[in-house]
Each structure stands twice: as C-alpha cells, then as structure tokens.
Amino acid sequence: MHRIRTIDSDFGKKRQKKMDNHISSMIYEIKFHEFVLFILEKKMGATRRTFLTDLARKKGFRVENELSNSVTHIVAENNSGSDVLAWLKTHKMEKTTQFELLDISWLIECMKVGKPVDTKGKYQLMESRVDSANPDPTAGTLNILPPTTKTISQYACQRRTTINNHNQRFTDAFEILAKNYEFKENDDTCLTFMRAISVLKCLPFEVVSLKDTEGLPWIGDEVKGIMEEIIEDGESLEVQAVLNDERYQSFKLFTSVFGVGLKTADKWYRMGFRTLNKIRSDKTLKLTKMQKAGLCYYEDLIDCVSKAEADAVSLLVQDAVWTFLPDALVTITGGFRRGKEFGHDVDFLITSPGAEKEQEDQLLQKVTNLWKKQGLLLYCDLIESTFEDLKLPSRKIDALDHFQKCFLILKLYHHKEDKRKWEMPTGSNESEAKSWKAIRVDLVVCPYDRYAFALLGWSGSRQFERDLRRYATHEKKMMLDNHALYDKTKKIFLKAKSEEEIFAHLGLEYIQPSERNA
C-alpha cells in the first residue's frame, strides 16, 4: 500500500493554516486508491473540516486539501446540490474533471464500517460528467451537470428514507404539532404534519429556504408558514405555545404510561390530575392491570431501549422459542430492523415452517410460562388469534392484524461487563442494587405462509405502511394488510414468500428496511 504526505494549503486563516500544517506533517497509509476526496468547507467550518479530513485519512482515504484535477469525490455537509453547484462554478479548474458529489453522511458511514460504501442513491447530491460534445480532456473547461431531478412521490413507499435526517429542526417541530392534534383527535391536521415530516426526512439535503421545497408533495401553506418562521427566527411561536400548554403537557405525560390511551388521558385531565404521583396516590382511581404495570415500571419503560439491549432481548426470545419450536424463525421488527439505535420497545415476529397449528397456538403460552418460572416475566397480556384464512384484507389503513400476540414487560439482567453503569451507590447494600431493567417486548406469531406480509407490516414505519396500503388501493386496485394481498380486479389472493415478491406484485421497486424510516 502507498503512503502519502499531505500537501500544505493556505485557506486564508492563520489558525486554519497552522492546523493544516500540523496535519501535513503526518503520514497516512492509503488503502482505497480509487477514491480521492475533497471535503467542502462551505457551511461546515474550518475546525470540523480539519477534524473530518484527519479522521478520513486515518481510515485509509486520500483527502486533498485543495480541489484539484485528481479529486474523484467531493463531500459536502448541509449543502443542497444547487449550493455545491454554485460553489463549483466559481472555482477555477485547469482542465475538465470528472467527480461525484456526495453528502457527508456517506463519509461518516464509510468510517463506521471501515471501508467505502456504495456512492449511488441516497448519498448523491448531484451528478457531474464531461460534456460529451467536448471530450477533449485538455479543453480547459469544467462541465458540471445538475442532478437528475426525479419527482418525489406522494407515497412514502416510493421514497427511500434512511435514519439520516437532514431536516430535524423542521421535523421535530412538526412532530410536536402532530402529537398535539392527535391529542385533540384532529386526525386530518395530524396527518398533514405527519406527511410533511415523512417528505422532509427523505430529502438528501437540508432545506435552507422555501425555494428548496418547490414541487415537494404534502408541503402546503400551513407547513410552509411554520418552516419560514423556523428559517428566519430559529423557532416557531406556535410550537412554543404548544410546548407551554398545560393540556399538551398532561396528555404527553399520561400517554407515556404503558396502557394509557387518549380516552384515559382525557379522563385523568378532566379529573384534575397533572402528575403521576397524584395518580399513584389516589386510591379511588381504578387502574387496569396494564396501567398498574406501566406505573410500577415507569422509570425503566420511558428510558429508551438501546440496540445492545434489544440484541440481548433477542437472545432471550430465541432461546425460549427454540426450546419449544427448534425450527422457528424469530425476527426482530420495528425500528431496530430499520437500523435505529434506540427504541421504546422490542418487537418480534415468530413463525415456523414445520409447526402444526396447535403448536403455533400454544407457543406463546409456553414461552411466557417459562419466563415466569425463571422470574423474568413482569407483565403479560396474551391476545388470542382471530385470523381467518380467506378473509379479505382490511379496508382500514391503520387496522391491527388478527394474529396471536402478547404484550410483555420482561426483566433484562445486565451483564457483568456493564456493571459500571449499574454500580451501587456508596454505602448501599448489595440487595438494594438493581441489576435489571424492565423492557417492553411484543411477540407476534403468524402462519408461515403469511410471514412475508406480517414482516412487512410489523417492520414499519407507520407512515411507510400507511402509504403502502394507500398505494395498493388507489394505484393498483388491490387490498393489502399484515395478512394478505388481494387483487380486486382478478378477484384472487396474491401469494408471496418474501417482501420482495410483495413489492413486485405492486409494481414497486423494492425498498430495504433501512430505507423505510418515513
């Protein structure tokens, strides 16, 4: 492998030049010769650029301090394709150069996995190439072509949405407003903001002006007004008013309790409750078994579940299920399947290619009984299956499925290597130390021939699934839910052994779970 000594460059700032000189004195080993990077300082800042440059070089990338003819990839942060294009047009080049323009998320992902990842698709800001009418590499001109602008679909199932959200300042604000309208049971306005959130999350750039939203679906006047306020003032008065609203605060607190929905939250609010301590201390209040468990383990349950904790729960679930059905498929679904690092619970889909119906029906009861004997079961609500083989998919977009399922709270013990996080306070007894955490777990059992449909439905996101069903209905005259896909024109059920086959039936390009974070 070759080694490279970086070249000094004057960026016009003494401090930056000093930092670059420090970097230039280091020697790094180049592992990936087909990549020559230039990191754009625009909107990033000199300090962060220097840090990322040094980090990329340590990982084996060749990074140029100046834009030169040898550069193959330009990496930018918080810039749209038009921003980078404008910057490039003002930059003088000695000869025609061919390169790709990439978002900084590409470089960060490369450094995570320790090697270059595919540059196509979600990481591209724009495409550039030599003008075919002027192929002479010595012609002395740079021909930059704007990106291929594809119309962003109104359907989330036709958009690729990773966990890399470039517009979080807007989506965070809209999530607050959407939640407030949900609390008011104003479903239409809630959906307005949820759709706007979904569109903004799929964008590979940060919206810096309302011009960037031209042509985008579901970005109406109400949404634009709030975005304009955030762009100009850094915040929205409407959002701040919601955050300060007593009803919103109370509903948000009450619905954070496992087992509490909008009706219960409204009842408690009307009864004058504002804190959970008041609810706990009121002996006249009748609570369900689920609500009692939610209050009992509240502190644990509102604490996010990490990917490491989800993996530990996966082992627990697999061991228990395989005790009774050795050939069972146990698949983690929900946000963790979509690549999220944190969640509020852990969902699993279970099926078995060789199990009899009686074995499937008895599985969850056997598994929960085992955990009860092991002292791991803190709460269990088992819902029996009402699934019917020939029943048409539901017409309701948000309909729940009819598979057997159980909603659990499990006791997850922490490993010894994690004991520093859970060590006892000075002077406490060992018996007082809490060595476990209460975790919310959902288990769903489905017949093997419905596994693909159930997996697609339980993987989410909610908006992705809503739009997938809406697309099937309005564009394909089909009905889709967690159980089946039905063609209303041909009057037949369409079978599928995989998610890919379901997408194919719908005439859609397959979208990986990691790109369904709509």
UniProtKB/Swiss-Prot annotation:
GO BP: DNA metabolic process; DNA modification; double-strand break repair via nonhomologous end joining
Catalytic activity of the protein: DNA(n) + a 2'-deoxyribonucleoside 5'-triphosphate = DNA(n+1) + diphosphate
Gene Ontology CC entries for this record: nucleus
UniProt source species: Monodelphis domestica (Gray short-tailed opossum)
UniProt KW keywords: Magnesium, Metal-binding, Nucleotidyltransferase, Nucleus, Terminal addition, Transferase
Annotated ranges, domain BRCT: 27-124
Residue ranges annotated as motif Nuclear localization signal: 11-17
CDD domains tied to this protein: NT_POLXc
SUPFAM superfamilies: BRCT domain, DNA polymerase beta, N-terminal domain-like, Nucleotidyltransferase, PsbU/PolX domain-like
Cofactor entry: Mg(2+)
This protein's name: DNA nucleotidylexotransferase
Family: Belongs to the DNA polymerase type-X family.
A Pfam family assignment: DNA_pol_B_palm
Function text: Template-independent DNA polymerase which catalyzes the random addition of deoxynucleoside 5'-triphosphate to the 3'-end of a DNA initiator. One of the in vivo functions of this enzyme is the addition of nucleotides at the junction (N region) of rearranged Ig heavy chain and T-cell receptor gene segments during the maturation of B- and T-cells.
Uppermost EC category: transferase
Compartments it resides in: Nucleus
Binding site for Mg(2+): 345, 347, 442
Note accompanying the cofactor annotation: Can also utilize other divalent cations, such as Mn(2+) and Co(2+) (in vitro).
EC number annotated for this UniProt entry: 2.7.7.31
Subunit structure comment from the entry: Interacts with PRP19 and DNTTIP1. Interacts with TRERF1. Forms a ternary complex with DNTTIP2 and core histone. Released from this complex by PCNA.
Region described as Involved in DNA binding: spans on this chain: 260-264
GO molecular function, one term: metal ion binding
Major place of residence: nucleus
Binding site for a 2'-deoxyribonucleoside 5'-triphosphate: 335-340, 344-347, 457-458
